[in-house]
Curated annotation (Swiss-Prot):
General function of this protein: Negatively regulates transcription of bacterial ribonucleotide reductase nrd genes and operons by binding to NrdR-boxes.
Domain ATP-cone, residue spans: 49-139
Cofactor dependency: Zn(2+)
The species this protein was found in: Caldanaerobacter subterraneus subsp. tengcongensis (strain DSM 15242 / JCM 11007 / NBRC 100824 / MB4) (Thermoanaerobacter tengcongensis)
Protein name, as recorded: Transcriptional repressor NrdR
A Gene Ontology BP annotation from the UniProt entry: negative regulation of DNA-templated transcription
Keywords: ATP-binding, DNA-binding, Metal-binding, Nucleotide-binding, Repressor, Transcription, Transcription regulation, Zinc, Zinc-finger
Domain of life where this protein originates: Bacteria
ZnF bounds (unnamed): 3-34
Cofactor: record remark: Binds 1 zinc ion.
Keyword Calcium: no
InterPro entries xref list: ATP-cone_dom, NrdR-like_N, RNR_NrdR-like
Length: 158
């Protein structure tokens, strides 16, 4: 590894350990010429994931887009941003670990709705109304009735 101080092409590894999130290896190195120490990170190169949109266009997967959509759905709701970031990270890990090169926006949307439903039902309905493109009030009411029915069934089990 080239020394960032003197440019010498060789160094030795003094310490090597995984990062806190286990996504990279942190290495402390020492230049064999000037003796200065520096840190490098070794990380697996991720292949790009493409999202297939409803109109069959393809665009690069962007984890931040999931977070932005949930923030919008949770506007004026008592949902901490930390919770939304954790959900985003969980969905992102699921997508990346699936090793797929392409995923539909529908699959991502369903994952988001599944998580939002357990966090905040109002946010869930807001997200669903945009994601599922509710055409009129009847479609909206159908979703609310379904949610109410699920809640009743949940209460009966308890």
């Amino acid at each position: 590894m080239k020394c960032p101080y003197c440019g010498y092409p060789d160094s030795r590894v003094i310490d090597s350990r995984p990062t806190d999130d286990n996504t990279a290896i942190r290495r402390r190195r020492e230049c064999l010429k000037c003796g200065k120490r520096f840190t490098t990170y070794e990380k697996v190169e991720q292949l790009p994931i493409l999202v297939i949109k409803k109109d069959n266009r393809r665009e690069l997967y962007d984890k931040e887009k999931i977070l932005r959509g949930m923030i919008k759905a949770c506007e004026k709701r008592p949902v901490p941003i930390k919770v939304l970031e954790e959900i985003t990270d969980e969905i992102d890990r699921k997508i990346v670990n699936s090793m797929v090169r392409e995923i539909t926006s529908a699959e991502i949307g369903e994952m988001v709705m599944e998580k939002l439903k357990s966090v905040d039902e109002v946010a869930y309905v807001r997200f669903a109304s945009v994601y599922r493109q509710f055409k009129d009030i009847n479609t909206f009411m159908d979703e609310l009735k379904k949610l109410l029915k699920e809640n009743e069934e949940k209460k009966q089990k308890e």
